[in-house]
Amino acid sequence: MEAQAQGLLETEPLQGTDEDAVASADFSSMLSEEEKEELKAELVQLEDEITTLRQVLSAKERHLVEIKQKLGMNLMNELKQNFSKSWHDMQTTTAYKKTHETLSHAGQKATAAFSNVGTAISKKFGDMSYSIRHSISMPAMRNSPTFKSFEERVETTVTSLKTKVGGTNPNGGSFEEVLSSTAHASAQSLAGGSRRTKEEELQC
């Protein structure tokens, strides 16, 4: 029994070696001359058929080009059509739609932000302008030393003018009264000068 088992074990590697030898063997030595001639004839026939098919394919391609030229479909038009189709296909994809929506949303946010900044700047300038006007018109501004000094200078000038034109007012008066009286005195002076000019013309 042991000898038989050992014999079986020894035959397995031999079978594998035989298969490798068969796979790498040259079958040409196993073929007869008639079989070789038949295979050679079949090989030539296949090569001829392949050559014929290539010629037919080339003729079909030339005919296709002629038809496209007659229809005005040149290479540039085909490229444009392919590009347009590819662009349309890309626009219909979910990824492109999401990207487009994201960019549009971001653009809207940027526009709104710039608008808010412009509004804030305009409001700030408006507040500054109002503050300046309000500061000038405030009583504190009128009571400031600078404004009082200016008012005193004007009042002194007006008083001197009144003295030259028609005399001073012994009772004094406020700044507004001084200006009013000065304007009235100036009007009377102009009227008197006009009457004297007419009288001189009549005497001449």
Curated annotation (Swiss-Prot):
Residues 1-20 are annotated as: Disordered. One of its GO terms (molecular function) is identical protein binding. Residues 22-73 form a coiled coil. The modification Phosphoserine is found at residues 29, 86, 122, 131, 149, 174. The keyword Coiled coil applies. The modification Phosphothreonine is found at residue 146. InterPro entries: TPD52. One of its GO terms (cellular component) is perinuclear region of cytoplasm. The modification Omega-N-methylarginine is found at residue 133. It comes from the Eukaryota. One of its GO terms (biological process) is positive regulation of apoptotic signaling pathway. Keywords: Coiled coil, Methylation, Phosphoprotein. Forms a homodimer or heterodimer with other members of the family. Belongs to the TPD52 family. This is Tumor protein D53. It comes from Homo sapiens (Human).
